[in-house]
Amino acid sequence: TVDRFGTVLVAQILSVGMEVRKEQLLPLLARVLRADGQQIDGIYQRNDAALRDKEGLEQGKGWLEIPGEQHPASTETEICENGVYYKVDFENGQKTGFFLDQKFNRRAVANIARGKTVLDCFTHTGSFALNAALGGAAHVTAVDVSESAVEMARRNAARNGLEDRMDFVCEDVF
């Protein structure tokens, strides 16, 4: 998987086949995007998934070192999706830091939330909760077992001016 957050590519490689080719393919991807006029400031590797153990691959994370290139100092960035602003921590967040594949589902939640009371379990960065609040939910409660995820969701709510309509709970929903 390669996700793009602003000017950073975040790669999560889970198979031997990709692992042995990453030193060629990841810089090539950055070069192709740059040739298209896009700014790419670095490639961050999130190779810390347990699935790598089953493939016999080492766990690790960090910037891909490409000779002659520098990468950003921060592993946090801000993105905007469907008019909602999010801080994304691609070093410590789940998977690559944000679930980009859920964009249309988040939009759907915004479209059905008006006037409702919403419970968002497993909130992570608060993405579904924020979309519900922006969609007109009367109140939203966002729950996650991770204190750092709850804190990121709080920050994202504040960034979008929604903290007065949302509660945040750090708890295991099971």
Question: Could you describe each region identified by the protein language model?
Answer:
Residues 16-19:
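Helix N-cap motif at beta-to-alpha junctions
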Residues 69-174:
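Rossmann-like S-adenosyl-L-methionine
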Residues 1-3, 21-98:
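Non-catalytic substrate-recognition/targeting regions of SAM-dependent transferases
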Residues 1-6, 116:
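Non-catalytic accessory regions of SAM-dependent methyltransferases
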Residues 8-13:
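Carbohydrate-binding surface patches
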